[in-house]
Amino acid sequence: MSKRKLVLSVVTAFIIVCLFGIVIIEPAEIWSRIKQNNEGMKVGYSDSVVYDGNHYKLLHPIGEKNESRYISLPDLKAITSVETAEKDEELTISYKNKKLTYDNGFIQNCSLTKDDMCGYEIIDGLIYIPDQSVERLGFQIGFFYDKQTNTVSIKSPEEQAKKPQDQELGSTIYVHKENVPAEKYEPRSGIYLGGYVLQDEYIDTSMNTFNKLTGKTHASYFKYVGYGKPFPKEWAEEVIAAGGFPQVAWEPNNGLNEVKDDEYLRQFAKDAGELNVPILLRYASEMNGTWTFYSGHSEQYIEKWKLVHDVMEKEAPNVMMLWNVFTMPESTIDEFYPGDEYVDYVGVNIYNVFYHNDKIEAKSDFEDPLRLLDYVYNTYSHKKPIVIGEFGVTNYTVTDGQHHDDFAVEKITRMYKYLPELYPRVKFIYYFDVNNLVNAPEGRKINNYAITEKKSILNAYAANVKTDQYLSKVEGDPAKSETYSYRDFFFYYGGELYADYKFVRDYLNMDVKESRGNSMKVTFNGKGIDVKQESLKIDKAAFFEKREVKGLPLGEILDAFEVENEIKDGDLHIQIAK
C-alpha cells in the first residue's frame, strides 16, 4: 500500500468519525494498526479448512496477526461461495443478504472500535480477509474439534441454525451395487437394535424392562463369557424369551494358549448350535489395544481365530463370527485381521467420554461418535457388514464430578439419528447400559453410561430408535442390492472432489498404482488413465492426531470410465453395474 493511500485511509477514517460521531481510535493508533497490518503474518495453521463438515484443501495458507486469522479471498470464495464485485478502489463481498463493501482497503461505515478489523491485507498480490470481517457476513469461525489440531472450522449461517447434534455432518459418497451376496442373517433394510443390561441394577438387569422403557423390542442382547466357561444356555433362552437373539462376547482372559481344539471348545460350539437361533460370537475383541491378555500377538491370534471359526462352522452353522476391535489405536488393527473367509462381520466398540483416561487435561467432549466409526467403516465395509459391538456415552464422570446430561443426549441422538442413513453397511448396534461407577472393577469406576436412570437421556434414546430402520427381529430374504457409503476421507480442492485412493480401489473395484511423479494410474475394464494425486492431512476423530488422505480426482475418474453418478442434496451417488 502506498504512502498516499495510507494517508487517504487515515483521513477517510477521521472524516467518518467526525460526521457520524462513532467511538474512535486515536489517529496515532490508526497509524500503528496500519503499520502492523503491513508486517508479515504468522503461519502454522493446518492447510485444510472444514466448512459445514467437509474438508477443503487451501490454495493459500491461513495466517494470524493481532489475534486475528486471515483467509485468502480466493479460498473464501471457493469454500463458502461468497460473491465478489470490484469497481475502481471498491470491493464488495456478499453472502445471501449480507455484504461488506471495502473502499481503499477499509470497510465502509466501519466503527473502528478496538475489537473490529476494518481492513484487509494484501500479500503477494492476494487479498486476505480477517475472521472478524468474515463473521460480519454471518459465518462462524472457530476450530474443528479442538484448537490443538490447528484446523479452522467455518460454519455457514444455515449450519449454525441447526441443533448441535445436526451440525457438521458433511457430505457422503454412496455406491449402489446389484447382486451382492448377504452374510449370515444380514439385514438389508435396517439395523438390528441391541443392548447390554446385565449390570443395570436400576432395572434389575431385565431385558423386558429395558424393552418397555425404551418403547422398542431389541433384536439382540449380549453377555460376556470367559473362555473356559460353558456356553450360557440359560441366559440365551432368556434372550429368546424377550424376543431377541444372543451375542456372546467370548474372551480368552487367560491368554491364547488355552484355546485348543479340545472337548471344551467342541462342547461350547455344540451347545451354541443346538440353540437353533442366530448367535453373534464376538470372540477375543479389542485385541488391537494393550489392555487384553491376547493383545500384541497377532500371528497367534489369527491362528486361534481360524481354529475357532472352523469348529463353529462345523458344529454351529448358526453362529456369525464377529471380529471386533476398539476405536483406537488404528495402527494395529489390520495386523489382527484373520482374512475375509474367516470373518462374517467386522465390529468396533465406540465410547463418547468427556475426558480420556480420567485426566482433566484430556478433554474429549468434541469427539463425534460417527467419525469415531469412520476408520473401521471405511477400511472394511466394502467387504464385510459392520457391527457396533458396544456404544456408550457418559452422563456423569468422577473426573470433574459433574453431570453431563446434555452431552449424553447430543451424542446418543447424533449416533442413532444418522447411523441408518449415513452408514448403511452397519447392521447391528448395541448400547452399553451400565453405570460403571457401581459395576466396574476398581480403577475403572469413572463414567456412568446408563440411559435408564435419567428421563431426558432415556427419551433421547427412545425417540431415535423407534423408527422402522431399527429392527426388532431377524430379517428374512434380504434384498440382492446393497448401498455402500464412504465418509470423511475425502476433500475438495480447486472445485474438484478428491477421494482417498483406497476408495477408488476398494469401493469402485478399480486398479490403482503409483505412476510418474505425483500421479497414479487408474485402470478399469481394460482402460487406463493417469491422474494427479493431491494429499491432505485431516484430523482424526480422537487424540489430536492427523491422517493423510491421498486423494484422487473422483469426477475425472468417473467421467473417464463413464460410470453413472449424480449429486443429490450435496451427496455423491455412484451406480456400479455388476
Q: How does the language model describe each region?
A:
Residues 193-195, 219-223, 246-249, 279-283, ...:
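Hydrophobic faces of well-ordered beta-strands that scaffold small-molecule active sites
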Residues 189-194, 278-280, 285, 387-389, ...:
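Substrate-binding cleft of secreted/luminal carbohydrate-active enzymes
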Residues 268-298, 319-328:
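Active-site groove signature of glycoside hydrolases
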Residues 193-271, 411, 418, 423, ...:
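N-terminal carbohydrate-binding/catalytic regions of secreted carbohydrate-active enzymes
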Residues 234-249, 355-397, 452-459:
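Glycoside hydrolase catalytic-domain groove-lining segments
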Residues 2-173, 473-578:
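Primary recognition of N-terminal secretory signal peptides and signal-anchoring hydrophobic helices
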Residues 258-280, 301-315, 319, 335, ...:
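An active-site-proximal structural segment forming one wall of the substrate-binding cleft
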Residues 334-364, 387-393, 432-434:
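Aromatic- and acid-rich polysaccharide-binding/catalytic face
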